[in-house]
UniProtKB/Swiss-Prot annotation:
Its EC number is 1.7.1.3. Keywords: Disulfide bond, FAD, Flavoprotein, Heme, Iron, Metal-binding, Molybdenum, NADP, Nitrate assimilation, Oxidoreductase. It comes from Neurospora crassa (strain ATCC 24698 / 74-OR23-1A / CBS 708.71 / DSM 1257 / FGSC 987). Heme binds at H652, H675. This is Nitrate reductase [NADPH]. Gene3D superfamilies: 2.60.40.650, Cytochrome b5-like heme/steroid binding domain, Nucleotide-binding domain of ferredoxin-NADP reductase (FNR) module, Oxidoreductase, molybdopterin-binding domain, Translation factors. It comes from the Eukaryota. Belongs to the nitrate reductase family. Changing H675A: Loss of enzyme activity. InterPro entries: Cbr1-like_FAD-bd_dom, Cyt_B5-like_heme/steroid-bd, Cyt_B5-like_heme/steroid_sf, Cyt_B5_heme-BS, FAD-bd_FR_type, FNR_nucleotide-bd, Ig_E-set, MoCF_OxRdtse_dimer. Residues 617-692 form the Cytochrome b5 heme-binding domain. Residues 1-128 are annotated as: Disordered.
Length: 982
């Protein structure tokens, strides 16, 4: 049977029917103001309304009284957040001085504007409790959906709220993509800025440099000066490249976090066109200059350096592309989350190109070498999986750097917003004879217009056209010279489309009740069409298959189910189908295909590693266990099973103390928390029996049998077999992702009791599982033998990095979130190395004498290295030579640099200590070594193995670095006993 032809329907954009359905709510000049005669409105919207709702909507917007909405669960909650809705715009120089009403943001002699103005900004007065635990401490809207936990701040608005606000999104509901903390210099919430801080932000400068004839340095104050720069205003829809990624993650986990369909927002941006700025700088495109790209760099300090990216110079110089350096958003100064005080806005391209907190614009011959440009915002071939993408091979490096895979222009995309997820429509009586109006949004990239939106109720056998409304076109009708928010409205001459559009289609309920689902697809003016099938890629970006909403027929109602919901919730038809065994990649959304062989997808069971020897049947009493609680033959218990650690005293990476300290104890929590799967697989070798049924409880009750060990007045804090508490008193930030945590010991005269070169164990309750603990080993930066009353621990905080599929450090994030005044438990010392001073050290209890230490470290691995180097440097009688090789990616990653440099100065008279820093991604001004700690560098700086055994290599850093260094040193003739890994 021939499929019905596409329903031919006049575009409602120009029809009278459309004008009845869509109402433009225009911002009022204010209650009682006579200078303009617009109706009182709440702004923002060319929003589709039901015909019978128009009068109610207009009536409801005629009030200018502030409203307060309490989003707390109880009115008595001290942590509740109050939101005040009010009109608060920045104005042009002819601002109305009548303070009884808001002045108009529009400057012209024309009548009232026919284009949308922003909704009233929402004033939030309280920092949310979750943000008090992060480095940002910013006031944020509690309605925003957090996609990566509390930090970093990556959020999207609820789809319903986003759509209901219409064409323009309030600043407080605009989606946010932050890779790390907000730069501290701009993190003060705008509502609390004092004059001094405001001036400092107006004095914020960014540079234009590189391959230009006239380098520039421009302050925000200068940028806003109409006598110096042509400020313009126009609307732009920003879209995260990960919008709709959750759908890809359900099919197959990508390396990115789960955006829903709300990863986009639209605002009126005010600033100066990048083409004008570059025209003054004059890029050197000829005479051997070769300028082809424009790189942007922000002020945020991240694990991989500052955030930066690039676009092609030809685009940046094209006024029609509309790339802007913006300082206002919806008439307001930028919020810190949106780039305060100045940012780049790149219309039609993914949001990742619009760099926030702008500090540098650099004209170059090639694309940006910034880590975030190379290893983010790419659609790699679908054959590249998560494991392969992380391989450190030349081939994989080449794939990542292939500019063909970089994402610039957005692709065409569309979403069904109404019906919403979980919405129920009644079919009872007269209601069932009516219609339902499907509504949603669509967008395209590169300035291209969405030219059609098609809807199918039969899974693509037939299609019908929806009407499309383009609110952006209303700005093209503005009169020449009209200003908005201090910038010339710069839209009328453009052919490009920078914004989303709205579509709608009336469907008889009688047809919906026969359908299994509703699918939509959009096409842009280049005839690019949304595909039916998903193109999965390892970063999960640019997902744009047909948007499908399932219809559930439940008696006399219809219930609608969207594909997914943002975050980690398993809500939506995709998760449901997957759990039912459906194959989401079968081309039919996981449904069973008539005539096709059923292919049930089963989840792989989690493989548990056995830690017992099944042949061992011996029962061990508590008395027997206690006979082995010393150093001679240490036994310990894990999960009720008894293990003999004696054979592994020599080989344990943490030294014999790690085992003898556990002797006679149940160390289940500690063992499972810190040991790898490989370590667990080794355990059957040391398994000797099972505790008798009554022994575990008795062992637990006797764990604190010696009161002297926990006596707070004892002179030494650390105990090898007992956990003792210290109070967190202060967190000292030393870099964006590193802090020194200060703890108060039991009394001011108490020493830590940690020999040089040893570590301690730290234990915290797991916030996600209160009945479980997190345990990790750390090396304090305190002097473990001399310092009294306090304990200082330097910790690099591994924040969640969704782009790289990293959940973040369990311990470090929990420690960072811990409130001051809370207790943390410690135990120790542990470790196989002790430096006794003046060249004497011991390894696993065996003493040896050295004349030279070569210490290789990276990142927070510097802490045990610093301990040893300090012990050498502060003792004028210690003639041991020290060479420290500290390798990092960027200069901001170097920890304790000033302390290490001070040690060098202190030991300078005898020239005993040298420190060399090397960076794999150095900045232009870096004067130290460049490159990785590789074979070439180790051969040059360390040399061949010392056959006399008078030199030791001490090594601490990331596992990959440690393995590489050990392998290289082995090839250079270094013996295993001369290379020690902390």
């Amino acid at each position: 049977m021939e499929a019905p032809a596409l329903e031919q329907r006049q575009s409602l954009h120009d029809s009278s029917e459309r004008q009845q359905r869509f109402t433009s709510l225009i911002l009022p000049n204010g209650v009682g103001c006579s200078s303009r005669e617009e109706p009182q409105g709440s702004g923002g919207l060319l929003v589709p309304h039901n015909d019978n709702d128009i009068d109610n909507d207009l009536a409801s917007t005629r009030t200018a009284s502030p409203t307060t909405t309490d989003f707390s669960s109880s009115s008595s909650d001290d942590n509740s957040t109050t939101l005040e809705t009010s009109v608060n715009y920045s104005h042009s120089s002819n601002t109305n001085t009548n303070t009884s009403c808001p002045p108009s943001p529009i400057t012209s002699s024309s009548l009232k504007p026919a284009y949308p103005l922003p909704p009233p900004s929402t004033r939030l007065t309280t920092i949310l409790p979750t943000d008090l635990k992060t480095p940002d401490h910013l006031i944020r809207d509690p309605r925003l959906i957090r996609l990566t936990g509390s930090h970093p701040f990556n959020v999207e608005p609820p789809l319903t709220a986003l759509f209901e606000h219409g064409f323009l999104t309030p600043q407080n509901l605009h989606y946010v993509r932050n890779h790390g903390p907000i730069p501290s210099s701009v993190a003060t919430p705008p509502a609390t800025i004092n004059k001094e801080e405001d001036d400092s932000l107006l004095n914020w400068e960014f540079t234009v440099e590189g391959l230009v004839e006239h380098p520039l340095k421009i302050s925000v104050r200068e940028l806003m000066d109409a006598s110096k720069w042509d400020n313009v205003t126009y609307p732009v829809t920003l879209v995260c490249a990960g919008n709709r990624r959750k759908e890809q993650n359900v099919l197959r986990k990508s390396k990115g976090f789960s955006w829903g369909a709300g990863g986009l927002s639209t605002a009126l941006w005010t600033g100066v066109g990048l083409s004008e700025i570059l025209a003054r700088a004059k890029p050197l495109t000829k005479k051997g200059g070769g300028a082809r790209y424009v790189c942007f760099e922000g002020a945020d300090q991240l694990p991989n350096g500052t955030y930066g990216t690039s676009v092609k110079l030809a685009w940046a110089m094209d006024p029609n592309k509309g790339i802007m350096v913006a300082h206002k958003m919806n008439g307001e100064n930028l919020h810190p989350d949106h780039g305060r005080p100045v940012r780049v806005v790149v219309p039609g391209q993914i949001g990742g190109r619009s760099v926030k907190w702008l500090k540098r614009i650099v004209v170059t011959k090639g694309p940006s070498e910034n880590w975030y440009h190379v290893f983010d915002n790419r659609v790699l071939p679908t054959t590249v999986g998560p494991e392969e993408s992380g391989e450190k091979t030349e081939e994989m490096e080449r794939v990542w750097r292939d500019e063909r895979y970089a994402i610039y222009d957005l692709n065409v995309n569309s979403v069904i917003c109404e019906p919403g997820h979980g919405e129920v429509v009644s079919l009872r009586g007269d209601e069932g004879a009516g219609t339902y109006r499907l509504r949603g949004y669509a967008y395209a990239g590169g300035g291209r217009r969405v030219t059609r939106l098609e809807v199918t109720l039969d899974q693509g056998k037939s299609w019908r056209l929806a009407g499309i409304e383009y609110p952006e076109d209303r700005y093209r009708e503005a009169q020449d010279g009209e200003e908005l928010f201090g910038g010339r409205l710069d839209v009328s001459w453009r052919e490009s489309c920078f914004c989303w559009c709205f579509w709608d289609l009336e469907i008889p309920l009688s047809e919906l009740r026969k359908a299994k689902d509703v699918c939509i697809r959009a096409m842009d003016e280049s005839l690019a069409l949304q595909p039916k099938e998903m193109y999965w890629s390892v970063l999960g970006m640019m997902n744009n298959p047909w948007f499908r909403v399932v219809i559930h027929h439940e008696g006399d109602t219809l219930r609608f189910e969207h594909p997914t919901q943002p975050m980690l919730t398993s809500d939506g038809w995709m998760d449901r189908v997957k759990k039912e065994g459906g194959n989401l990649a079968n081309g039919f959304w996981g449904e069973k295909v008539p005539g096709a062989e059923e292919n049930v997808v089963k989840e792989e069971p989690v493989k548990e590693i056995s830690m017992v020897d099944e042949k061992v049947t011996r029962l061990i009493t508590l008395e027997e266990l206690r006979q082995h609680d010393g150093e001679e033959e240490p036994w310990f218990v894990v999960n009720g099973q008894v293990y003999n650690g004696t054979p592994f005293l020599e080989g344990h990476p943490g030294g014999a103390a790690s085992i003898t300290g556990a002797a006679g104890q149940d160390v289940t929590d500690e063992f499972l928390a810190i040991h790898s799967e490989n370590a667990k697989a080794m355990m059957p070798t040391y398994h000797i029996g099972t505790l008798t049924p009554s022994a575990p409880a008795a062992l637990k009750s006797s764990s604190t049998s010696d009161p002297a060990l926990s006596d707070p007045s004892r002179p030494i804090f650390l105990q090898s077999k007992t956990w003792n508490s210290a109070i967190l008193t202060f967190k000292e930030s030393v870099s964006p992702d590193t802090k020194i945590f200060h703890f108060a010991l039991s009394h001011p005269a108490q020493s830590i009791g940690l020999p040089v070169g040893q570590h301690l164990m730290m234990r915290l309750p797991d916030p996600a599982k209160p009945t479980e603990s997190i345990i990790r080993a750390y090396t304090p930066i305190s002097d473990g033998t001399l310092e009294r009353g306090t304990l200082r621990v330097l910790v690099k905080i591994y924040y969640a990095s969704p782009t790289e599929d990293i959940k973040g450090g369990q311990m470090t994030q929990a420690l960072d979130a811990l409130a001051l005044g809370k207790a943390v438990e410690f135990k120790g010392p542990v470790g196989k190395f002790v430096y006794q001073g003046r060249g004497v050290c011991s390894v696993n209890g065996r003493e040896r004498k050295v004349k030279r230490f070569v210490m290789v470290c990276g990142g927070s691995g510097v802490t045990p290295i610093y301990q040893v180097a300090e012990a050498v440097a502060v003792d004028d009688q210690d003639g041991t030579e020290c060479l420290v090789l500290d390798g990092n990616r960027v200069e901001g990653d170097i920890l304790m640099k000033s302390e290490l440099d001070e040690l060098v100065e202190r030991a300078k008279p005898m020239g005993r200590c040298r420190v060399k820093y090397t960076l794999s991604r150095p900045g232009a001004e870096w004067e130290g070594l460049r490159g990785r700690l590789d074979k070439t560098m180790l051969e040059r700086e360390v040399g061949e193995g010392d056959l006399r055994g008078e030199t030791m290599v001490l090594l601490c850093g990331p596992e990959g670095m440690q393995n590489m260094v050990r392998e290289v040193l082995k090839g250079m003739g270094w013996k295993d006993e001369d290379v020690l890994v902390f």
